């Protein structure tokens, strides 16, 4: 692909230096449809990024777009705080009937604000309020958001340093396989909890991602998650699952914890819950935890009604037919895994490991700078991928769940070429 030099001057002179994704993809995007984005010069890019997981159903999904346009054309409420609206009712009914009831999940639904970190902040606040304790346990390489409470339970040193103040009341513990399986799971954690001389304040809750997306595609085993849930129950701690990136079908089932057979006390959901890339987040919790006073936690943009419209349409379109969406995602995931096996076999001296679940995969190279070079070459070849991990050492694959097998094969062949050409 021949890419002419785009005019990026206004971004470079007016926008803050904090911008990041645009540095790796130096073009001006103009439109998008399905699994492709197009720049101003008409160049097409196959998207294996999906808005960092906020576009599980692709760009400008036609069913969701039609529902949104119809709603706006009839002057439906756009901004509603937490007022009762027809759009919110339609979403809550769809979510209850299509997601919660079939899974026997009795969760109450809270709208904490537009973004994932809003959901995490509300989850941490609620856990502390319920238990009357301050400490929260998180895990190595976790990522839960960029606001101060979320940063306190995030592992990445670079992101934590941006807080500018001490990040307190968060205690990190080793994630699954952090010690390469050499140390029994939870041995250290449980010993600290039971030892009155350990110096560990009893936590209110444990927050965990079943797959650490930003942390490097670290996949927790189902048995590890079950053991964690049992430990929380024994020690009177709430279990919070952060399903912001891995929920909404990303790993196959709607919730990423379903495979493990656990029922978290609190669940945070965002990114693809709106289905269309519109800001929306949820904090779900067991009814007995709903001890909020009216208005005790709020936010101006927690009632994003256009997002409720597309969210309801997404649930009705993709999740009304039992396990069809889950089966499709798992089949696409097997296609990705087979391609990564081939790439690994062709680069045995260079590849450290590949790992993933559903349609989230990563491939790690022994040379920590290799992932960045691969992502850059992939962009030049018309494929959008990002890196993850504490040192950006993992190539991360996050295509839309609606991607076709042909598009997936095209992108995987481009990835293999980028790997070869950066050796």
Curated annotation (Swiss-Prot):
One of its GO terms (molecular function) is diaminobutyrate-2-oxoglutarate transaminase activity. It is an enzyme of class 2 (transferase). Its cofactor is pyridoxal 5'-phosphate. The keyword Transferase applies. Its EC number is 2.6.1.76. Keywords: Aminotransferase, Pyridoxal phosphate, Transferase. Transmembrane segments: none annotated. PROSITE patterns: AA_TRANSFER_CLASS_3. The keyword Transferase applies. InterPro entries: Aminotrans_3, Aminotrans_3_PPA_site, Dat, Ectoine_EctB, PyrdxlP-dep_Trfase, PyrdxlP-dep_Trfase_major, PyrdxlP-dep_Trfase_small. The modification N6-(pyridoxal phosphate)lysine is found at residue 271. Pathway: Amine and polyamine biosynthesis; ectoine biosynthesis; L-ectoine from L-aspartate 4-semialdehyde: step 1/3. It holds the Pfam family Aminotran_3. GO terms for biological process: ectoine biosynthetic process. Belongs to the class-III pyridoxal-phosphate-dependent aminotransferase family. This is Diaminobutyrate--2-oxoglutarate transaminase. It comes from Streptomyces avermitilis (strain ATCC 31267 / DSM 46492 / JCM 5070 / NBRC 14893 / NCIMB 12804 / NRRL 8165 / MA-4680). The lineage of its organism: Bacteria, Bacillati, Actinomycetota, Actinomycetes, Kitasatosporales. The gene is ectB.
């Amino acid at each position: 692909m021949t890419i002419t030099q785009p005019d990026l001057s206004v971004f470079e002179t007016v926008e803050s230096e904090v911008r990041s994704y645009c540095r790796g993809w130096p073009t001006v995007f103009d439109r998008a449809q399905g699994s492709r984005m197009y720049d101003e010069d008409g160049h097409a890019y196959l998207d294996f990024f999906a808005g960092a997981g906020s576009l599980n159903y692709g760009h400008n999904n036609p069913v969701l777009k039609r529902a949104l346009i119809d709603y706006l054309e009839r002057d439906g409420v756009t901004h509603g705080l937490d007022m009762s609206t027809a759009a919110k009712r339609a979403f809550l009914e769809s979510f209850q009937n299509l997601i919660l009831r079939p899974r026997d999940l009795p969760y109450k639904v809270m709208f904490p604000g537009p973004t994932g970190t809003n959901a995490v902040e509300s989850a941490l606040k609620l856990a502390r309020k319920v238990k009357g304790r301050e400490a929260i346990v998180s895990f190595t390489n976790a990522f839960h958001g960029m606001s101060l409470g979320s940063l306190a339970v995030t592992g990445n040193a670079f992101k934590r340093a941006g807080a500018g103040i001490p990040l307190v009341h968060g205690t990190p513990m080793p994630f699954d396989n952090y010690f390469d399986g050499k140390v029994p799971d939870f041995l250290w954690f449980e010993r600290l909890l039971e030892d009155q001389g350990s110096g560990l304040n009893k936590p209110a809750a444990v927050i965990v991602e079943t797959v650490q997306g930003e942390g490097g595609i670290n996949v927790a085993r189902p048995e590890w998650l079950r053991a964690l849930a049992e430990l929380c129950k024994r020690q009177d701690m709430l279990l919070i699952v952060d399903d912001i990136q891995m929920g909404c079908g990303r790993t196959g089932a709607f919730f990423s914890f379903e495979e493990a057979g656990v029922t978290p006390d609190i669940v945070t959901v965002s990114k693809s819950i709106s289905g269309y890339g519109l800001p929306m987040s949820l904090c779900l919790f067991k009814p007995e935890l709903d001890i909020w006073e009216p208005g005790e936690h709020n936010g101006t943009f927690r009632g994003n009604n256009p997002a409720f419209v597309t969210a309801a349409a997404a649930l009705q379109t993709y999740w009304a037919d039992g396990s069809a969406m889950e089966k499709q995602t798992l089949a696409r995931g097997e296609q990705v895994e087979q391609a990564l096996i081939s790439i690994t076999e062709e680069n045995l001296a260079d590849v450290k490991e590949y790992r993933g679940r559903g349609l989230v995969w990563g491939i790690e190279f022994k040379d920590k700078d290799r992932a960045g070079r691969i992502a850059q070459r992939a962009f030049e070849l018309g494929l959008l991928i990002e890196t993850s991990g504490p040192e950006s050492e993992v190539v991360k694959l996050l295509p839309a769940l609606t991607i076709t097998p042909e598009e997936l094969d095209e992108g995987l062949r481009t990835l293999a070429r980028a790997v070869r050409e950066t050796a």
